[in-house]
């Protein structure tokens, strides 16, 4: 069904940030592995996260919803995970599927995995290759794409692994396999990626070490045989989801948007750093901590943005925010260049191609490159008037709908159903701010 976002004069209001998707996945996984019971509040109840919970239940954990965003998890502890009776369907969840591949590698179990058409087109060899070195067996073909069957090993071997591409999911899968491996597992990163796995594992009682190797390589080390213990935690607000609301405030001529309880983590701050470089009017107030993460309230109001060359050192810390950054670039004055972002080619869609198509159909001049794109900003309101093919990508859909609130003409999208994978409250939150989005 087509949905259309109509231009509005003002977006204003206060919104509590939805629970962070990355932390929500990890909470259910680590709680399911731990000894005893864990209790979580503020958990994101998007389809991706719920499928992770279902997978943990299928392998022996008890996962119970006790209220909106509140979940209790009783872990399997020392007895470990068991083979699920049916196929584990991860839907669109790359995070859940990849992290659980690492978990399954260290248990005496066999599991068949699948997903939707988008997930089954995404590369999994980048995760499978190091796990195979550790002892995982699988039935994946040469392209490493789902569906396939995994068989774990009780005698997993620790390795030192340097991922060829910066990827928090690959790092996390290897570290999670390392929990049950013989010896010390080390992941060596040339570029630091989001560190929620390391932070949350420590919260569950695991011991990790961090060191700097020659050449500025970051090493994360974990000794096998460690047991996790249950944890009570509040899930911090998702900075990637908050970015859509913050961008809406920046583009609204009378914008006055406050997003509360947003996680402030240097491995996730790239979008906000780049927005600041573009001249964004942002304010931040301390709010405390949740699950070992600093929380802030972020305020945004209208700002005349300018184009920049996005520093490549920030790419990994904003890999999910490039679609909404492209929208800001379209409204900015001057040229915005994105380079070093080839990882976008293998997200829920080919996000480089999807971003370029989204802008072009709405009258924005943009050039596609192999590792990014270059946007010629309109210096104000973009023409709009286009129908965006979302390619079943939730972040393309949300970005286009934000664009429509400040464009000259309404902007339409071909589908919004996939938004539920990461931000089920997006439509209601936008309506609270004053957006006019209709089917």
From Swiss-Prot:
CDD domains reported in the protein's UniProt record: EPSP_synthase (cd01556)
Gene Ontology molecular-function annotations: 3-phosphoshikimate 1-carboxyvinyltransferase activity
NCBIfam families: aroA
This protein's UniProt keywords: Amino-acid biosynthesis, Aromatic amino acid biosynthesis, Cytoplasm, Transferase
Catalytic activity, EC: 2.5.1.19
Pfam families the UniProt entry points to: EPSP_synthase
Pathway(s) where this gene product acts: Metabolic intermediate biosynthesis; chorismate biosynthesis; chorismate from D-erythrose 4-phosphate and phosphoenolpyruvate: step 6/7
Primary location group: cytoplasm
Positions that bind phosphoenolpyruvate: 21, 94, 122, 169, 351, 395
Subunit architecture: Monomer.
Stored InterPro entries: Enolpyruvate_Tfrase_dom, Enolpyruvate_Tfrase_sf, EPSP_synthase, EPSP_synthase_CS, RNA3'P_cycl/enolpyr_Trfase_a/b
Main function: Catalyzes the transfer of the enolpyruvyl moiety of phosphoenolpyruvate (PEP) to the 5-hydroxyl of shikimate-3-phosphate (S3P) to produce enolpyruvyl shikimate-3-phosphate and inorganic phosphate.
Superkingdom of this protein's organism: Bacteria
Native source species: Hyphomonas neptunium (strain ATCC 15444)
Protein name: 3-phosphoshikimate 1-carboxyvinyltransferase
Top class in the EC scheme: transferase
Gene Ontology biological process terms from the UniProt entry: amino acid biosynthetic process; aromatic amino acid family biosynthetic process; chorismate biosynthetic process
Residues annotated as catalytic: 320
Intracellular or extracellular location(s): Cytoplasm
The keyword NADP belongs to this UniProt entry's keyword annotation: no
Residue sites binding 3-phosphoshikimate per the record: 21-22, 26, 167, 169, 320, 347
């Amino acid at each position: 069904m087509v949905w259309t976002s109509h231009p509005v004069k003002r977006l204003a209001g206060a919104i509590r940030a939805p629970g962070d998707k990355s932390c929500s996945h990890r909470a259910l996984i680590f709680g399911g592995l731990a000894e005893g019971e864990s209790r979580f509040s503020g958990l994101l109840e998007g389809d991706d996260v719920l499928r992770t919970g279902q997978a943990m239940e299928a392998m022996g954990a008890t996962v119970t919803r006790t209220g909106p965003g509140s979940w209790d998890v009783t872990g399997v502890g020392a007895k470990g995970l068991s083979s699920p009776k049916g196929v584990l369907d991860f839907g669109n969840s790359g995070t859940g599927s990849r992290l659980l591949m690492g978990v399954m590698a260290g248990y005496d179990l066999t599991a068949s995995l699948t997903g939707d058409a988008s997930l089954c087109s995404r590369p999994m060899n980048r995760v499978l290759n190091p796990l195979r070195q550790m002892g995982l067996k699988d039935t994946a073909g040469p392209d490493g794409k789902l569906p396939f069957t995994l068989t774990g090993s009780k005698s997993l071997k620790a390795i030192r692994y340097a991922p060829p591409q910066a990827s928090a999911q690959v790092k996390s899968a290897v570290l999670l396999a390392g929990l049950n491996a013989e010896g010390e597992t080390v992941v060596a990163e040339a570029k630091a990626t989001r560190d929620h796995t390391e932070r949350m594992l420590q919260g569950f009682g695991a011991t990790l070490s961090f060191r700097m190797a020659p050449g500025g390589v970051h090493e994360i080390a974990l000794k096998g045989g460690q047991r996790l213990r249950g944890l009570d935690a509040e899930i911090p607000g998702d900075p990637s989801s908050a970015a859509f609301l913050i961008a809406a405030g920046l583009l609204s001529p009378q914008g006055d948007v406050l997003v509360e309880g947003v996680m402030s983590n240097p491995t996730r701050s790239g979008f906000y750093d780049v927005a600041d470089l573009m001249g964004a009017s942002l304010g931040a107030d301390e709010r405390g901590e949740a699950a070992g993460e600093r929380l802030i309230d972020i305020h945004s109001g209208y700002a005349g943005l300018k184009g920049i060359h996005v520093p490549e050192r920030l790419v990994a810390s904003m890999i999910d925010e490039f679609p909404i950054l492209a929208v800001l670039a379209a409204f900015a004055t001057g040229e915005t260049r994105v380079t070093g972002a080839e990882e976008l080619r293998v997200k829920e869609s080919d996000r480089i191609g999807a971003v370029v198509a989204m802008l072009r159909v709405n009258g924005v001049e943009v050039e596609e490159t192999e590792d990014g794109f270059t946007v010629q900003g309109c210096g104000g309101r973009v023409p709009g008037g286009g129908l965006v093919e979302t390619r079943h990508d939730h972040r393309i859909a949300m970005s286009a709908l934000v664009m429509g609130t400040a464009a000259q003409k309404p902007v339409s999208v071909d589908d919004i159903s996939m938004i539920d994978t990461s931000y089920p409250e997006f439509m209601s939150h936008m309506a609270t701010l004053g957006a006019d989005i209709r089917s």
